[in-house]
Amino acid sequence: MSSGIVTAAYIVAAILFIFSLAGLSRHESSQRGNTYGIIGMAIALIATILGPHSANVGWMIVAMVIGAVIGIRLAKKVEMTEMPELVAILHSFVGLAAVLVGFNSFIASEGHADVVMENIHLTEVFLGIFIGAVTFTGSVVAYGKLSGKMSSKPMMLPNRHKLNLAALVVSFILLVIFVKTESVGLQVFLMLIMTAIALAFGWHLVASIGGADMPVVVSMLNSYSGWAAAAAGFMLSNDLLIVTGALVGSSGAILSYIMCKAMNRSFISVIAGGFGTDGSSTGTEEEMGEYRESTAEEVAEMLKNSTSVIITPGYGMAVAQAQYPVADITTKLRERGINVRFGIHPVAGRLPGHMNVLLAEAKVPYDIVLEMDEINDDFSDTDTVLVIGANDTVNPAAQEDPNSPIAGMPVLEVWKASNVIVFKRSMNTGYAGVQNPLFFKENTQMLFGDAKDSVDAILRAL
């Protein structure tokens, strides 16, 4: 296959990737967007394998088969509840690949006669390894936190921001020396030192971020993995990899910015690491008062007597796989003429759009699934709100307690409804480790137990 045909194939693949992103931005077209992405990737792989500069095609096919087998196994094995940690670990692979490509590009380089071109190449190698290493360890930490293998609490090192700044400054100095020196031995030594710094830097960046902010971290790492892929594209002189990496990097950065606005966080503080780490609390159960318990039968009766119901799901719904009986309850209530809608917080769950994916999987109509800004004004006119597995995203302390770690974060104002039913396993705090005053309000009742079991019991009572 000639280089011209390969270039044309890359252009078609890049356009399909853009269509894929556009399709994935809406529920209605998400399946079509996925299809565009699959076709684009297939074209890119075929063009790369059959390209004029391809060598060791047999090894490439072996690697593809191994990757495909692993991918198919993961697709069949991994539950929707495990999707956040799967995304995180996949990001780590992109980062590690960029590191390996960087070292390989340096070793395989025969040098450039033009000094400027040689300096550009060395800068590409250095930055590619740095970004890849940060993405790799950052994603590994995110995977550990999301899967429960690591504590969700932030790592509070003294002078952590100064340490981050020092890592960047030292890495920049190493870059300058790396480009200026003509000693290959010194360049290898500098690359190894920089890689160690970048690995520690990536680990510290994510480890110092509080658990409640993990959805932002996932989208941020998505952006990092895109830039790592773009850096690999520069080192490999692969135009499609550069374009694809830039698409992923920019879309991830935009998503992170949107989510930061939804959480009243600074985008810079996300990149710097260590936000959402205030250790203060909003008080103990004894200080807040008593909570009231309810039963599935009582909740069913309350729902029958309601004219409007809003359901606000959270990660607890995902863990319990309660989206299917929730969809069944929605259908039954709508058949009775009750107005049922869903209120989705931008950072509900452990992944951007986590709840939307679960509800779409359960065939909940798209038009009744509303974002926080679209539904917040309607809670005061709502008879009953079902809070299923959500905690921090419905915490009134964000508005009422200036000393709360989540102070200023926009939340779903569920407490303004006539009745609030909170589905929880226990009175433990949420992922942010903050007690929720909602549980102790007069119009709130607690329904303890597994969310799926509770919803099934309500469904039977209806």
Where are these regions (language model features)?
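Structural signature of hydrophobic alpha-helical transmembrane segments
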Residues: 1-14, 51-69, 121-136, 184-197
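C-terminal ends of transmembrane helices
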Residues: 16-29, 68-87, 139-154, 200-214, ...
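Cytoplasmic-side transmembrane-helix entry/capping segments in multi-pass membrane proteins
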Residues: 31-40, 60-63, 82-94, 154-165, ...
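Transmembrane alpha-helix boundary signature
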Residues: 48-61, 73-83, 99-116, 179-183
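Transmembrane helix-loop junctions at the membrane interface of multipass transporters and ion channels
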Residues: 104-116, 180-185, 216, 223-244
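Mobile "lid/hinge" segments at catalytic clefts and subdomain interfaces of large enzymes
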Residues: 210, 224-268
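Membrane-interfacial segments at transmembrane helix termini in multi-pass membrane proteins
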Residues: 247-306
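Structured cytosolic domains appended to multi-pass membrane proteins
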Residues: 287-462
